[in-house]
Amino acid sequence: MSEVAFQDCYPDELSHCYGCGKNNTAGHQLKSYWQSDNQNSQGLTIAHYTPEACYTAIPGFVYGGLLASLIDCHGTGSAAAVAFQQANRAMGTLPPLRFVTAALNVSYIAPTPMGAELELIGTFIEVKEKKVVVEITVSANNVICAKGTVIAVKMPDSMLNVKC
């Protein structure tokens, strides 16, 4: 696994996302990585997250909206990482390559137990210059609890406030 999270490579001006922004202390602070040390091919991505009690749906189980949020942020972070890879650029170099969610589809497979570390695995389905499709599985205790598909599109210039 790489040592620096994808989200930690985002410019400060683009790091305020509730789900993954390093500058949002009230947020989830999700951190995504390449699953293996081989970052030269479109491999798998991985993230881990342990829900706090405030994300309870009913006692003992995680709120589904949290799972959707984690899938969303792991998907867009994975899209940014593969875009940098495809451009033969180091993550964090300017101009930024950031992606936003164009579509999110989540299927809940099994109840997600509270108190377990969640593992998110991202698999690339389609990679184009301005669009990346990532499938994400969320597991707890080695049981798949949710699956999601994120269609991520390159962030429009109108949203970028970064000066190169």
In which residue ranges do the predicted regions lie?
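Conserved beta-strand residues within beta-sheet cores
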Residues: G27-Q29, H48, T101-N105, E119-I121, ...
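Hydrophobic residues in beta-strands and at strand termini
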Residues: Y49-P51, Y108, K154
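Non-catalytic linker/capping segments at the edges of enzyme domains
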Residues: M1-I58
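Exposed regions on extracellular, virion, or secretory-pathway luminal proteins
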Residues: Q39, G60, I109-P111
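Hydrophobic beta-strand-centered segment that forms part of the acyl-chain substrate-binding groove
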Residues: G77-E119
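A conserved, well-ordered hydrophobic junction motif at loop->secondary-structure transitions
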Residues: S41-Q42, I46-V82
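HotDog/MaoC-like acyl-thioester-processing domains
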Residues: M1-D12, A110-C164
